[in-house]
Amino acid sequence: MADLAKIVEDLSNLTVLEAAELSKLLEEKWGVSAAAPVAVAAVGSAAAPAAEEKTEFDVVLVDGGAQKINVIKEVRALTGLGLKEAKDLVEGAPKPIKEGVSKDEAEKIKAQLEAAGAKIELK
């Protein structure tokens, strides 16, 4: 069980780009597809409560701004990406930086990246 807990912890610490790469590698290795099956919506699902407060946010880099070097440095610090990957992410904006983070963490990341000169959007 300790091995499984370690695997779960390691997977939880992956960045979005690393998780996508892992998914591709596993698809190739096992010969499967990670595409989600299309689900038919239930009749009662339209009446879902709309007043629920969002608890998980995606931090999306809209624009790298004029100070791209500073933004790249911040992206590297926040995501653990290498220089080339962080540069590609900043220059390929709009791109998600972090996904599924708490509101407090998303606001903190947004403030750091905006201080470096980036335009950020929380979704």
From Swiss-Prot:
Gene Ontology cellular-component annotations: cytosolic large ribosomal subunit
Any Gene Ontology biological process: translation
Protein's UniProt keywords contain Ribonucleoprotein: yes
Signal peptide start and end residues: none
Keyword Lyase: no
A molecular function GO annotation: mRNA binding
Keywords: Ribonucleoprotein, Ribosomal protein
Family, similarity comment: Belongs to the bacterial ribosomal protein bL12 family.
Role description: Forms part of the ribosomal stalk which helps the ribosome interact with GTP-bound translation factors. Is thus essential for accurate translation.
NCBIfam families, A to Z: L12
Subunit structure, interactors included: Homodimer. Part of the ribosomal stalk of the 50S ribosomal subunit. Forms a multimeric L10(L12)X complex, where L10 forms an elongated spine to which 2 to 4 L12 dimers bind in a sequential fashion. Binds GTP-bound translation factors.
Protein name (database record): Large ribosomal subunit protein bL12
